[in-house]
Amino acid sequence: MQTQAQRFERGGATLVDEMFGSRADRHIVFLHGWGANRDSLRGIATLFQPTHHVHLIDLPGFGAAPLPPDGWSTIDYADLVQAYLLERISGPVILVGHSFGGRVTVRLAARRLPGIHAIVLMATPGLPASPLSKSGLRRWGIRTLRALLKLTRGLTGPGALAWHTRRFGSKDYLAAGPMRDLLVRVVNEDLTASAQDITCPALLMWGSDDRDTPPWLAYRYLELMNSHGTRATLDMLPHKDHFLYSGTGAHLCAFKIRGWLNVIDAVMDHAR
């Protein structure tokens, strides 16, 4: 497989794009999750090589891409990817985002760029849980305990906060290193308004056993999008977890995406 990787720089930030495929007029862009890189989506991306020009991207701070500037959020990531799309790609684009990459995809699709043909969100967070839900109550309890430990630091000592971080910090948080402040900002973002602004066709793909981004998020995204004019479809994959595209899941996900793209292309052709 012939591949070409190149850097794209804008505003002091850099992404790395690896391109391959046979069709110069149909582009599909893959955006990876937090703590991952373009290799994480290579298995599913290569399956689109016969039908699309494939773009595998390392977002700033991941893979071969250097750290982003201080103070970044998903808005800044979307700005960078948008600049890349406008400068490097001519023709309709399908965006496929997993987890964190899905957050960036939501931000981009909400801008209604004419070149974005459709989006695929895979196991994407970004919507707040109900305060009275199990996850909402747990989050409130964890934050309240941390606030109390900070107030009583003179009595409990610094070890109490360190214990709290080890006990309740996510794997991503514990491994984030210099990206930790960015991660905190990202996980506290609410993409509700952005989801409501999306008008292009959207496929939501989730694993029924996903504990990182539980299925209620998929149904909430579906509700938000379809109540505001989006042609959104949900495909819940039985017994799949957060990494629904891994292993044999790559072929299953690619099959589902291809089938969905054929349907929306037929609908659009009929509308013309």
Predicted regions located by residue number:
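Conserved HGGG/HGGXW glycine-rich cap/lid loop of the alpha/beta-hydrolase fold
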Residues: E18-A64
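Active-site glycine-rich loops that stabilize anionic/oxyanionic intermediates
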Residues: G33-A36, S99, P125
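Active-site loop/oxyanion-hole signature of alpha/beta-hydrolase fold enzymes
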Residues: H55-V96, S246-H251, F255
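Flexible "cap/lid" loop of the alpha/beta hydrolase fold
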Residues: V106-A110, I116-K150
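Conserved alpha/beta-hydrolase catalytic His-Asp/Glu region
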Residues: A147-C200
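Short beta-strand/loop motif that positions the catalytic acidic residue
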Residues: D197-I198, L204-W206, D210
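Acidic catalytic loop of the alpha/beta-hydrolase fold
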Residues: D209-T213, F243
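Catalytic active-site module of serine/aspartate enzymes centered on a nucleophile-bearing elbow/loop
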Residues: T230-R272
